[in-house]
């Protein structure tokens, strides 16, 4: 039986309108058991200032971002289910959902799925990796009942 342990930290000045802890749990449970039976993840919801500071410190990018992934790397002789931390910026997620004409809850789900795949070692640095990661994300999002996250909901195609 698979188990996903979530440590949800809300560090936003305004927590009104955020997805529920149950939402975050459901999204993680759609991803992590596909790869390992027991997983522990911290999700920290932050405002733009914290996202900006972390993005500058760890990625050298002078702006806030939607999701940052910090994988936990234990020494090889120690087996721990701790995957790492996801830092998700509320304002960036909300702004992107509007700009990309996506349902807000679907975009939140996509950020959790996307960030979780990064914790599992997936990346999108080159085209082949990006294509593989996007296919996995799209399949998981469909399983959750959401549309393809790489197509705008109002896209005429």
Curated annotation (Swiss-Prot):
Enzyme class: hydrolase
Enzyme Commission number(s): 3.1.-.-
One Pfam family linked to the record: YbeY
Annotated GO CC locations: cytoplasm
Job of this protein: Single strand-specific metallo-endoribonuclease involved in late-stage 70S ribosome quality control and in maturation of the 3' terminus of the 16S rRNA.
Family matches, as PANTHER family: ENDORIBONUCLEASE YBEY, CHLOROPLASTIC (PTHR46986:SF1)
Name of the protein described by the UniProt record: Endoribonuclease YbeY
Species whose genome carries this gene: Yersinia pseudotuberculosis serotype O:1b (strain IP 31758)
Lineage of the organism: Bacteria, Pseudomonadati, Pseudomonadota, Gammaproteobacteria, Enterobacterales
